[in-house]
């Protein structure tokens, strides 16, 4: 993951900036970056040619996309919420997933650390059940992070959790089987960057203290990755897709993306490719993801401000670390997390919320508690998140709108007044009520919008939702 800030900046509320709101300074999106992290080499412009609209939004690719992928993209677009998991050898040191880079640990020393990894309390049923209780529709887990250690059974290298550790089990296989049983889709995070493999050469902007010889075969490294991807796509049943990360480490390298993307779609036609390269979408990709940011906001400083036509995804840490960090107690509140989830939905994006399990395989109580509280909120308000898209009113400082069919959901995240005026025009509102208890909301339509009179100013809820039933036609 991108680890590009050395300071901790926290906001109580995340506000969204979209192309439609370029003139609304109060509505600019921000998701806090994380602590104590190295600066990544920025990517150069990609080689693909994108046609941009005046608003800076990439137009859909004209090449035909198979029906299976179109259906998978639509499923993803409607999913709303997923659970991200960063877990690996680095968890043992309790200092985040970049500890090998940050502490300049040589590869041989890190190999010894890997040989001690034994997460005996890992329970796939417990993890998937927690995701389900949280209301997550999918899980994305690190199959291999930048440290180069494979968290699955692979014949491409012995440097994996089955062959190298006393654990001798394949947690990804157990997780895949449990996801199938509980009806949750599984995505595999896969790092293109590798601080361990000798053929990751020439070296990129990171991993230079690993002690590897200054030689290697890049073509052989690409073949190694494709062999592992083939294993992930053939040994674990149907998967949701591959979530790539790390290409930014060598922006000028030939990553042979066309070959790799073709391989993935050939092995599993419905598998989605989700690249975390922080650029406008490239041919063959299926989802555009934004790290620690809402789409188009780029408050983190490394995401693109171009919003493409693909389904959107925004990933977020629950504190300031992706991997387990024993000293990171800067947990976001459930209110903040719900706010990010709602603002993502109002920006046509899913929220992928991260947890970093402990080295023994257990999940920190704080993370589990927040997930269950989000799940409880979704039990009541999920209808305004799942299977919706951004509503007719662009994101504002007070909140966002989402929509399904003729129903518009007005999300009040930061509004403590009984009166609210919104610029809703072109439709006639037939009924307004509060989601949850169904209390009627008085309203008046005017030529310039809709005036709403709420039953109360609110009692500190993370999000008050007004349901508007509409029909097309004059107001």
Pin down the residues of each PLM region:
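Mature catalytic domains of secreted/periplasmic carbohydrate-active enzymes
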Residues: 59-475
């Amino acid at each position: 993951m991108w680890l590009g800030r050395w300071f901790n900046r926290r906001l109580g509320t995340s506000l969204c900036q979209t192309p439609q709101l370029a003139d609304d300074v109060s509505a600019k999106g921000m998701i806090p970056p994380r602590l104590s992290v190295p600066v990544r080499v920025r990517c150069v412009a990609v080689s693909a040619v994108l046609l941009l609209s005046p608003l800076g939004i990439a137009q859909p690719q004209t090449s035909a996309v198979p029906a299976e992928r179109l259906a998978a993209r639509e499923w993803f677009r409607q999913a709303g919420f997923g659970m991200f998991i960063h877990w690996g050898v680095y968890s043992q040191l309790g200092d985040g997933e970049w500890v090998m880079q940050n502490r300049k640990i040589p590869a041989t020393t890190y190999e010894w650390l890997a040989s001690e990894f034994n997460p005996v309390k890992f329970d796939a049923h417990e993890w998937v059940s927690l995701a389900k209780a949280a209301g997550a529709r999918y899980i994305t887990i690190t199959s291999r992070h930048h440290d180069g250690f494979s968290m699955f059974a692979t014949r491409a290298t012995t440097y994996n959790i089955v062959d190298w550790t006393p654990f001798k089990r394949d947690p990804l296989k157990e997780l895949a089987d449990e996801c199938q049983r509980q009806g949750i889709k599984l995505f595999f995070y896969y790092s293109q960057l590798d601080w361990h493999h000798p053929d990751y050469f020439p070296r990129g902007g990171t991993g230079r203290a690993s002690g590897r010889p200054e030689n290697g075969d890049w073509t052989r490294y690409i073949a190694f990755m494709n062999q592992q991807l083939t294993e992930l796509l053939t040994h674990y049943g149907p998967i949701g897709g591959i979530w790539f990360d790390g290409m930014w480490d060598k922006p000028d390298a030939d990553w042979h993306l066309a070959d790799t993307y073709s391989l993935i779609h050939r092995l599993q036609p419905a598998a989605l490719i989700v690249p975390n390269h922080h650029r406008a979408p490239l041919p063959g990709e299926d989802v555009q993801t934004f790290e620690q940011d809402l789409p188009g906001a780029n408050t983190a400083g490394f995401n693109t401000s171009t919003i493409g036509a693909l389904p959107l995804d925004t990933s977020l840490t629950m504190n300031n670390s992706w991997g387990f960090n024993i000293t990171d107690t800067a947990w976001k509140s459930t209110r903040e997390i719900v706010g990010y989830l709602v603002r993502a939905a109002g920006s046509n994006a899913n929220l992928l919320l991260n947890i970093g399990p402990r080295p023994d395989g257990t999940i920190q109580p704080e993370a589990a508690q927040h997930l269950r509280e989000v799940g409880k909120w979704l039990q009541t308000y999920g209808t305004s998140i799942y299977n919706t898209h951004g509503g007719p009113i662009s994101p504002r400082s007070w909140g966002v709108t989402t929509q399904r069919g003729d129903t518009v959901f007005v999300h009040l995240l930061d509004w403590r007044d009984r009166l609210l005026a919104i610029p809703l025009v072109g439709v006639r509102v037939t009924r307004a009520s509060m989601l949850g208890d169904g209390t009627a909301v008085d309203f008046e339509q005017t030529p310039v919008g809709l005036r709403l009179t709420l039953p109360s100013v609110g009692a500190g809820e993370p999000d008050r939702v007004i349901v508007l039933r509409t029909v097309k036609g004059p107001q």
